[in-house]
């Protein structure tokens, strides 16, 4: 029996609301386990990788790096049609992220003799994590590697878990080729994050690690961020749908099921101003859950789901901003009214014909997004995650002279006389010996 929360939003208890808002907060529960694995990888390198790959993936590997022969075999196995679809998705992702690219270097004249600017520089190396396990995720390879390449990152590697026979799914390898990854390693879980953060005999250390994963992977990313920068916490998938009476119940239900099939911990919520729609969606969800291919996972996941009835669109929007969803679908007649008031969302999908899966695969927007409420403080993966910025100042003597008194006054007020003297030195001052 599927137990899904179905209530008027105003009747949701404080405990129920807290469960919805603070979803996915299991990092502390696995922290010690993750820390131990990371420590082993840091100290033992490849030996630890072999140990944990055998323990968790149930496979012994002679080599972690995918060979050129394995890439060629993968490309021959998937066929030209599927490869063509990968290339379509890749080109859309590439085009969208190219549009995000800032001007590499720009300048402005603040005042005569004072020219300020900014220079964007790509990171030197990035490691992309692509989950495995229940399914292969070649789309994640595209979403992580392509923006890094567009940004101009010099070295991009991928880590993804091996299958039981020690291979990587051919579609994942094909995606790595299409996206332009330099190397792919058969490594998953915490040990993969540790390898990319610390470096081993085989796996190069990277400047930044990006990509989603389970609670163990997310915890590992959080723990290594003093060594390698990360994108953001990206855990079990989630969707929030804001709908009114104009929405299609079957479509909304199918989007709830689509999220639920990701993971038993996935979260799907509908908040609507229409009680009729709420009832129809609930019935559709229960029916579709029985017939969908991954029914067992879906039914477990739906225990985290909710159908909520709001008094107004304003109440829907207020709930959404508190929930801060990874994916937000807006299925209302006046979508602009809602969009203008949304503050916190990883990626937004507007209309009955913009379901989350189109963004997951091929529209071009990025599907690596903050979850568990982190959309309040993080943006989804974008070109800026692969760039760093240096400010520039070009100042002439006359320009410095116009700022001289201000700088000297502020420096001396802070008790930093040498700062003030460095300004005076440009105008003939020499400190006494």
From Swiss-Prot:
Biological-process GO terms, alphabetical: L-histidine biosynthetic process
UniProt enzyme class: oxidoreductase
EC number: 1.1.1.23
Pathway the protein acts in: Amino-acid biosynthesis; L-histidine biosynthesis; L-histidine from 5-phospho-alpha-D-ribose 1-diphosphate: step 9/9
GO CC, one annotated term: cytoplasm
Record PROSITE patterns: HISOL_DEHYDROGENASE (PS00611)
Residues the entry annotates as binding Zn(2+): 259, 262, 360, 419
Alphabetically ordered keywords of this record: Amino-acid biosynthesis, Histidine biosynthesis, Metal-binding, NAD, Oxidoreductase, Zinc
GO molecular function: histidinol dehydrogenase activity; NAD binding; zinc ion binding
Cofactor(s) for this UniProt protein: Zn(2+)
NCBIfam families attached to this UniProt entry: hisD
Family that this chain belongs to: Belongs to the histidinol dehydrogenase family.
Listed name of the protein: Histidinol dehydrogenase
Species this protein is from: Methanosarcina mazei (strain ATCC BAA-159 / DSM 3647 / Goe1 / Go1 / JCM 11833 / OCM 88) (Methanosarcina frisia)
Gene behind this protein: hisD
């Amino acid at each position: 029996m599927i137990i899904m929360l179905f209530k008027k939003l105003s009747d949701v208890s404080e405990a129920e609301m807290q469960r919805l808002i603070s979803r996915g907060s299991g990092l502390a529960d696995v922290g010690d386990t993750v820390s131990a694995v990371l420590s082993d990888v840091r100290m033992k390198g490849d030996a630890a990788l072999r140990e944990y790959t055998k323990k968790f993936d149930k496979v012994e590997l002679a080599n972690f790096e995918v060979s050129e022969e394995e890439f060629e075999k993968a490309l021959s196995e998937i066929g030209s049609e599927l490869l063509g679809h990968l290339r379509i998705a890749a080109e859309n992702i590439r085009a969208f992220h190219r549009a995000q690219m800032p001007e590499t270097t720009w300048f402005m004249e603040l005042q005569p003799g004072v020219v300020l600017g900014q220079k964007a520089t790509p990171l030197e190396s990035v490691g992309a994590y692509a989950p495995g396990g229940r399914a292969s995720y070649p789309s994640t390879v595209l979403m992580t590697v392509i923006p890094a390449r567009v940004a101009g990152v010099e070295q991009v590697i991928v880590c993804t878990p091996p299958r039981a026979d020690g291979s990587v799914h051919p579609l994942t390898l094909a995606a790595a080729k299409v996206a332009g990854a330099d190397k792919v390693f058969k490594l998953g879980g915490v040990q993969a994050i540790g390898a990319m953060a610390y470096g081993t005999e085989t796996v190069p250390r990277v400047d930044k690690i990006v990509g989603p994963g389970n609670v163990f992977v997310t915890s590992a990313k959080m723990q290594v961020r003093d060594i390698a920068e990360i994108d953001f916490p990206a855990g079990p998938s989630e969707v929030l749908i804001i709908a009114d009476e104009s929405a299609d119940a079957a479509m909304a239900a199918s989007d709830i099921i689509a999220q639920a099939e990701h993971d038993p911990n996935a979260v799907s919520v509908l908040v609507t101003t229409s009680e009729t729609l709420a009832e129809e969606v609930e019935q559709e969800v229960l029916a579709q859950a029985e017939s969908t291919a991954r029914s067992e996972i879906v039914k477990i996941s739906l225990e985290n789901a909710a159908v909520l009835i709001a008094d107004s669109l304003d109440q829907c929007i207020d709930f959404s901003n508190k929930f801060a969803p990874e994916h937000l679908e807006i299925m209302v007649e006046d979508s602009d009214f809602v969009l203008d008031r949304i503050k916190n969302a990883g990626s937004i999908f507007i209309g009955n014909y913009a379901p989350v899966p189109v963004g997951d695969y091929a529209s071009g927007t990025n599907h690596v997004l903050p979850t568990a409420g982190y959309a309040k403080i993080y943006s989804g993966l974008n070109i800026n995650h692969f760039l760093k910025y240096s400010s520039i100042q070009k100042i002439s003597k006359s320009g410095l002279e116009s700022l001289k008194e201000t700088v000297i006054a502020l420096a001396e007020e802070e008790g930093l006389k040498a700062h003030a003297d460095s300004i005076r030195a440009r105008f003939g001052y020499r400190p006494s010996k």
